[in-house]
Amino acid sequence: MEQQRKLFQQRGYSEDLLPKTQSQRTWKTFNYFTLWMGSVHNVPNYVMVGGFFILGLSTFSIMLAIILSAFFIAAVMVLNGAAGSKYGVPFAMILRASYGVRGALFPGLLRGGIAAIMWFGLQCYAGSLACLILIGKIWPGFLTLGGDFTLLGLSLPGLITFLIFWLVNVGIGFGGGKVLNKFTAILNPCIYIVFGGMAIWAISLVGIGPIFDYIPSGIQKAENGGFLFLVVINAVVAVWAAPAVSASDFTQNAHSFREQALGQTLGLVVAYILFAVAGVCIIAGASIHYGADTWNVLDIVQRWDSLFASFFAVLVILMTTISTNATGNIIPAGYQIAAIAPTKLTYKNGVLIASIISLLICPWKLMENQDSIYLFLDIIGGMLGPVIGVMMAHYFVVMRGQINLDELYTAPGDYKYYDNGFNLTAFSVTLVAVILSLGGKFIHFMEPLSRVSWFVGVIVAFAAYALLKKRTTAEKTGEQKTIG
């Protein structure tokens, strides 16, 4: 391993992109158990639970669908992170195995560039709004600071809270996995206290019976419950399309495959059991108690009389936003941008570039057209499902769990593998799978497929790529020399 690392360094690769040595792989089961809790318990996910009630499904059906989703998520996170835990290599380099040295840049930029940076900015802005609530409860005069002053549409209090929250997120990004580990270890028990406590509060207010009988006003019980049950599972799993595709950014630190597999599985299942119970109890209970559909946990917290309870709850919600932003956005963006110019950029350079771009796009302006921006990001997310399918088919079916690292860490300008550095089979399969999974957003008769787009994209891409690559034994590169 040391000889390989020295060779790759001579080719110009930065330390951040090199395969981790065994001594550098320090993450154990507990680290992975705590990793994703904040990404499960965040404001958008709780709002999503409210949307599930609109489908007309029962409370129990929604809870069961959410819990079952955890097993699909865990399976994909573990399996797509297998190469990372085996070889200690980040996503940006693993992607080269299936798409080619040059071809990997396109799906990599979709995930680590466009989607991650835009979501990072949007999450920073959303978090700053919660921060504004928090400061406003302690210091009401802060909300009128600066009078009518605005900068690019932001008031002075809004600008201050955004920059503070942005800087905290950037700091976590610079710290990488080591800082994130310490942060999530503190966050996890706080999540149990806040969201578990909110669930108990909701049950004590209205009782468990009314919660299980809750249906939003004007909504009829669903007739095609089986398909809608699958739609709920797809919606929950699809949220993880981006983190799952770049799972190796975290599994590269694993002490062993078993540690990351056990830790992620237990962590995600436990997190989603709590989320399923707390989510439906909080949303249904609050809606019944206040006499109106109330699906945003921040709106619920704002109604509380206790300043301490509100302060602590909003603080934890802010922490979950930071955790989500780190695991899902800024850390993958840092690695991916570094991979664009591996001889010139480091991970921290990537974090800095991504952070600055997230400021320049003015996320508060993007939020003025929420429907358009979320549709755009949803389409990008829909493209990542097929990428997962291709990556897993290549690693497990075509290469049978083996990767030739020397062919991933090629010298600059060396594109002898695949067609000038592009795996055209991977791109063709990805395109077909994307059309099938997202076509329903634009073509009416394909609409049912788009409602289960993540499953369609992953399954079609996995099956098609595995079949095509198995049959194509005499490609230009030849299967014996295929990257991976």
Where are these regions (language model features)?
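Juxtamembrane transmembrane-helix boundary signature
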Residues: I66-Y99, R111-Y125, I282-A286, I322-S323, ...
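Transmembrane alpha-helical segments of multi-pass small-molecule transport proteins
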Residues: G108-L109, I135-G175, P189-M198, L228-A247, ...
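Membrane-interface "cap" regions at the ends of multi-pass membrane proteins
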Residues: M1-T59, F71, G196, L205-G209, ...
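Hydrophobic, membrane-embedded alpha-helices of multi-pass small-molecule transporters
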Residues: W27-Y46, T161-V168, A199-V206, S217-V280, ...
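Hydrophobic alpha-helical segments and their helix-loop junctions in multi-pass secondary transporters
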Residues: C124, S128-K137, C190-G218, V239-W240, ...
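C-terminal membrane-solvent junction of multi-pass transporters and transport-like membrane proteins
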Residues: P19, S23, V387-A464, R471, ...
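Selective recognition of specific alpha-helical transmembrane segments in multi-pass small-molecule
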Residues: H41-N45, L68-V76, R111-Q123, P189-S204, ...
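Membrane-interface loop-to-helix entry segments
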Residues: Y125-S128, I160-S204, Q264-L268, F376-G385
